[in-house]
Amino acid sequence: MQARQPPHDRILDAAMRVFRRHGFRRSSIEQAADEAGLTRQALYHHFPSKEALFCAAIERLYERAVLAETAAAKAAEATDAALSDILIAEIGARLGTLFAALEGSPHLEELFSEHLAQARDPYQTYSARFEAEVAKTVARVCRARRLKLASGVTVEELARCGEMAIHGTKSAYPSMQPADAFLNQLAVMLRMLIAGAMAPQTAPPAKRSQRKVCVSTGDRR
């Protein structure tokens, strides 16, 4: 028998459907309550306002994105993928989780805008976490493979530049749609960024000849 979904999760799932369908401004507590199969008073027992409900839904989405990006990075590492491919997989999984939650909504730009206004604290907290996860991946891969960053480049700076690449790609795709085009362009930027951040690989020294030389005759054997 399938376990019943906890009320908190059921409400947030319903709220995301409502926000995706109507946008933030045209959504209401009543709509979210109806979608969750609750009365308005019952929903208020969990969340005091539409703004609090939206903020909680966004925060849960961010947490799922962290889990997705961490799993994607480790999976890519296990295949011996290049550092650039690992980071592209990691950041792509994070963004893919966010895209999937809002897929099909005609209110994408509004939702992206409102989440910055209504969920400012979670946005700042998770932005730092996202960047920290990328930094941990870079450090872990470089340590395991004995890779070195270019002189003057730190793990933290590379991770920060990776996040800036996301914002840079947004300038061409403000709503990050179509998602495939956005992610492809972001991948190009990340590859170029990472290539420039790595120190040149040092070639191993050439092996010396092992042939013996006979001193007395000069003959080589």
Predicted regions and their residues:
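N-terminal intrinsically disordered/low-complexity leader segments
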Residues: 1-5, 201-221
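Helix-turn-helix
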Residues: 10, 14, 18-52, 56
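Amphipathic alpha-helical interaction segments
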Residues: 10, 85-93, 110, 153, ...
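Alpha-helical DNA-contacting segments of helix-turn-helix folds
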Residues: 55-61, 65
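Hydrophobic alpha-helical connector segments
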Residues: 56, 70-100, 155-159
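Amphipathic alpha-helical packing segments from all-alpha helical-bundle domains
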Residues: 66, 85, 97, 117-144, ...
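Helix-loop "lid/cap" segments that line or gate small-molecule binding pockets
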Residues: 72-73, 92-99, 106-116, 193-194
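Amphipathic C-terminal alpha-helical segment
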Residues: 93-100, 131, 135-136, 140, ...
